[in-house]
């Protein structure tokens, strides 16, 4: 369970288990866990694989990649679906100890029903080559996100510090469901979940400056 500030509790990961996986930054909160916290979880789980899902790390988060040299049971997974806007291509990758990667290669075709086709492979390679565009795009999204945070604060919203391409916000006075309906009527689409603890929050994706100014 997440604590009052939307952080994971490392004690939850110190129980007997068959493996550990968690997102960093988190979705839908955008909250980032420190490398110290991740290392604490790794130290408590030396005999199982610990997977850190970094789908949103390119929007200002700190990657756990530096910890790979110390922990052979760590796997870091990332995707092209978010920061590179290539969700339809089904491109992702995993970085870890050579032995773990070997085991993954041995079994990947037995459970992966979304293997990449040739166009996806070609586009993925070209996307990696265009580092200038990638950095410019993520830098712009981060700048827009930080500006929108200030605007939302002035409008009475509260939210955890997001390191993703969205903001998980709630208003001090207006219920989230009421805001969700009003925004939808204005053709502005945000995410709302009618679930315990998050029912009074909206996940607001960061778009262009023009879109956010609406």
What is each stretch, according to the model?
Residues 1-7, 56, 79-81, 195-196:
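Short, acidic/turn-prone active-site loops that include or flank metal/cofactor-
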Residues 7, 88, 163, 197-200:
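Short acidic/glycine-enriched loop/turn segments that link adjacent beta-strands
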Residues 36, 182-186, 191, 195-214:
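PLP-dependent enzyme catalytic core of the Aspartate aminotransferase-like
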Residues 141-142, 151-186, 202:
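Conserved PLP-binding catalytic core of the aspartate aminotransferase-like
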Residues 96, 169-173, 206-208:
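Short beta-strand-to-loop capping motifs
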Residues 4-58:
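Active-site phosphate-binding strand-loop segment of PLP-dependent enzymes
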Residues 73-153, 157-160:
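PLP-dependent aminotransferase class I/II
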């Amino acid at each position: 369970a997440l604590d009052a500030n939307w952080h994971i509790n490392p004690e939850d990961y110190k129980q007997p288990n068959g493996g550990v996986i968690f997102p960093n930054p988190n979705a839908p909160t955008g909250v980032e866990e420190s490398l110290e916290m991740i290392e604490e979880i790794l130290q408590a789980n030396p005999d199982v694989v610990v997977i850190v899902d970094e789908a949103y790390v390119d929007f200002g988060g700190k990657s756990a990649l530096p910890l790979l040299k110390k922990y052979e049971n760590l796997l870091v997974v990332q995707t092209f679906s978010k920061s590179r806007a290539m969700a339809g291509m089904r491109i992702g990758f995993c970085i870890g100890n050579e032995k773990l990667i070997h085991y993954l290669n041995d079994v990947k075709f037995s459970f992966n029903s979304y293997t990449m086709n040739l166009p996806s492979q070609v586009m993925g390679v070209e996307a990696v080559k265009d580092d200038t565009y990638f950095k410019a795009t993520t830098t712009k999204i981060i700048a827009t996100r930080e500006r929108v945070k200030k605007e939302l604060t002035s409008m009475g919203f509260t939210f955890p510090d997001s390191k993703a391409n969205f903001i998980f916000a709630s208003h001090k006075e207006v219920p989230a469901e009421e805001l969700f309906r009003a925004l939808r009527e204005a053709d502005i689409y945000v995410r709302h979940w009618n679930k315990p603890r998050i029912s009074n929050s909206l996940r607001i994706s960061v778009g262009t400056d023009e879109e956010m100014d609406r």
